[in-house]
């Protein structure tokens, strides 16, 4: 029997490697096995590289187009090279870990595998996320080699090939640095948690619960999008992927009850992007922030909670005003699951409760993820429809590895970026430049950092976007006097908001594709709906109580005034509060939402009184 070498034909091999990676991670992260930390990172990157080359071709092919056998052979050779790199490290581990950095010679073999690894990492990043991150990393690597030839303002002293190889490959500074370390030890566990939750079909409770809660609310489908996307999004590492995951259900529903197509696409884009800001997982960025800021996971999650609530409150108020203003309908009865059915499945939420409880108790993040995943397997046994068979269990493990490809490739590539920044010092030059441009103005500095974070975050998934802006932008804000966690949260927000900021608003484009609307129109509506999120980071820099920093009364007062301000801004943006607003009322709402406590409350209160009196004179059907 002849064997044809095709992508489909090697799938069993690819799935075998995916299963091996999942078992490798379970064995060594749960404490059953012990492996040197450096070797674990090398093995993880090699696994990820092999899987990308086995699962993902170099380009997308049309339905009837056949992939050239030569291309597949090249991919297999690249996968073999990744395995050879791991073998090289395993055979020379003692030599590599005990050598005197920058003094001992770099062997020809090390130079070869270093060059190969860098090229392989750039290619797997391109295949999983596109060109954006690859261009940034490639530019910085070229800068490391040729930066000594540039003008004085940006030049460095020059580095030999050996020094660059050592820094990016032999030390835990480049490919095998902090980002891939977090991916290996932490992120994979949460990706596995999400994969098991989905494969068990227990995640269906998210959508059903959202439909039940909003069944009697005007414009209900848009509110379903908010609740479902907040739940799905926090365990997803990609805003665009979340749009496709929940938007295929919510966007057609929104259009059905009367929302315009671009508005429906924008709502889903903003709701899905917000999932990256919502604890406990925050698209896995919370764990990276805990490491890079040194704040610890619990402090990061606590700090992120109130701003995330403000984000979703603003979106909820805006779409409610849109629904009332245009007299949009509710969910039809056939769209709403029976209350008894939903209540009987509420225990599907127990794994998330277990995760939050264990994290709150201060247990290790890896332990929490593993126990939460185990709870899914045990609870799934209670019903035949959710129970794992041997086949579905293996499929969940394979799905875990496949789900880790994008974020892991990005972490490896981000390691290259961070490595070059630390080697050349260009990050410090950038910090000094924007500090000089801002002068003594904290506000100007924040504006420059906001714009920088937008640009650096464009088209890049959550995790690498945060790594890049945290490395370049956060130190400038810290230098200006902001607490470390506040600075990291500030740049993180704007890197994420690039997903809904034209011209490169990938989440909005995904929403537009499903809604069949114009991409840029959807993008600008998403920008409008997410406007509060663009203001909140400025608020918590000036008032850290919004991040839970300070005394309890101060935090409560900051929360109350922020909520009032958010409602004012939402009303001003939608030209609606209790009824349609006049020009001066809209101005008062916007100014009041942005103003200090007493002035802002006074302006909003005055508009509310005027509109209440107007409604009494001429009742509005809503």
Where do the PLM segments sit?
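Conserved, well-structured core domains of diverse proteins
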Residues: 1-105, 111-115, 621
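Long, contiguous bundles of hydrophobic transmembrane helices that form the permeation core
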Residues: 2-14, 18, 302-403, 506-590, ...
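Membrane-water interface regions at transmembrane-helix termini and the short interhelical loops
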Residues: 3-4, 28-33, 56-68, 117-131, ...
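Alpha-helical transmembrane segments
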Residues: 38-46, 181-191, 299-314, 364-373, ...
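Core transmembrane alpha-helical segments of multi-pass membrane transporters/permeases
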Residues: 84, 123, 128, 138-153, ...
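Membrane-interfacial loop-to-helix junctions in multi-pass transporters
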Residues: 107-112, 173-186, 212-226, 257-263, ...
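Transmembrane alpha-helix interface/packing and boundary motifs in multi-pass membrane proteins
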Residues: 126, 194-198, 229-238, 270-276, ...
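Hydrophobic transmembrane alpha-helices that form the pore/transport pathway of multi-pass ion
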Residues: 207-275, 281-285, 294, 462-494, ...
């Amino acid at each position: 029997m002849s064997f044809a070498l095709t992508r489909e034909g090697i799938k069993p091999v690819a799935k075998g490697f995916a299963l091996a990676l999942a078992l490798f991670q379970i064995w060594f992260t749960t404490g059953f096995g012990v492996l040197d930390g450096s070797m674990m990172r090398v093995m993880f990157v090699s696994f990820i590289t092999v899987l990308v080359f086995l699962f993902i071709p170099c380009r997308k092919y049309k339905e009837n187009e056949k992939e050239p056998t030569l291309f597949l052979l090249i991919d297999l050779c690249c996968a073999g090279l990744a395995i050879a790199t791991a073998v090289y490290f395993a055979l020379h581990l003692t030599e590599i870990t005990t050598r005197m950095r920058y003094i001992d010679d770099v062997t020809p073999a090390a130079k070869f595998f270093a060059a190969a690894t860098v090229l392989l990492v750039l290619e797997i990043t391109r295949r999983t996320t596109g060109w954006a991150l690859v261009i940034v990393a490639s530019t910085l690597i070229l800068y490391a080699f040729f930066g000594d030839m540039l003008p004085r303002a940006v030049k460095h002293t020059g580095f030999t090939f050996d020094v660059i190889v050592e820094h990016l490959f032999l030390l835990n500074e480049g490919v095998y640095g902090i980002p891939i370390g977090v991916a290996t030890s932490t992120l994979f566990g949460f990706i596995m948690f999400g994969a098991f939750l989905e494969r068990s079909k227990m995640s269906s409770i998210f959508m059903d619960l959202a439909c039940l809660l909003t069944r009697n609310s005007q414009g209900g489908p848009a509110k379903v999008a908010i609740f479902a996307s907040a739940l799905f999004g926090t365990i997803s590492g990609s805003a665009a992927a979340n749009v496709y995951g929940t938007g295929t259900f919510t966007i057609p529903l929104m259009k059905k009850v009367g929302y315009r197509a671009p508005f429906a696409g924008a709502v889903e884009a903003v709701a899905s992007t917000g999932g990256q800001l919502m604890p406990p997982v925050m698209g896995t960025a919370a764990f990276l922030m805990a490491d890079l800021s040194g704040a610890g996971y619990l402090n990061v999650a606590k700090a992120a909670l109130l701003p995330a609530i403000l984000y979703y409150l603003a979106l909820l108020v805006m779409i409610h005003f849109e629904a009332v203003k245009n007299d949009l309908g509710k969910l039809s009865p056939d769209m709403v699951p029976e209350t008894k059915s939903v209540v009987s499945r509420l225990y599907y939420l127990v794994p998330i409760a277990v995760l939050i409880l264990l994290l709150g108790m201060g247990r290790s993040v890896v332990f929490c993820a593993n126990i939460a995943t185990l709870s899914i397997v045990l609870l799934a046994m209670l019903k035949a429809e959710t129970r794992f068979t041997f086949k579905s269990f293996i499929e969940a493990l394979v799905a875990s590895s496949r789900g880790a490809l994008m974020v892991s490739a990005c972490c490896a590539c981000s390691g290259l970026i961070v490595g070059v920044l630390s080697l050349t010092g260009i990050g410090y030059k950038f910090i000094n430049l924007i500090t000089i441009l801002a002068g003594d103005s904290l506000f100007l500095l924040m504006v420059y950092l906001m714009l920088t974070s937008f640009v650096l975050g464009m088209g890049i998934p959550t995790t690498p976007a945060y790594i890049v802006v945290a490395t370049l932008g956060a130190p400038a804000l810290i230098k200006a006097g902001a607490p470390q966690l506040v600075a990291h949260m500030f740049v993180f927000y704007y890197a994420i908001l690039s997903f809904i900021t034209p011209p490169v608003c990938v989440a909005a484009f995904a929403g537009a594709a499903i809604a069949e609307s114009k991409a840029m129109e959807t993008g600008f509506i998403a920008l409008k709906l997410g406007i509060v999120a663009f203001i909140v980071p400025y608020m918590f820099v000036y008032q850290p109580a919004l991040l839970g920093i300070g005394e309890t009364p101060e935090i409560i007062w900051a929360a109350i005034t922020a909520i009032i301000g958010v409602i004012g801004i939402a009303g001003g943006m939608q030209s609606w509060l209790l009824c349609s607003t006049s020009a001066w009322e809209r101005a008062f709402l916007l100014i009041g939402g942005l103003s200090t406590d007493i002035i802002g409350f006074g302006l909003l209160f005055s508009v509310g009184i005027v509109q209440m009196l107007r409604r009494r004179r001429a009742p509005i059907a809503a």
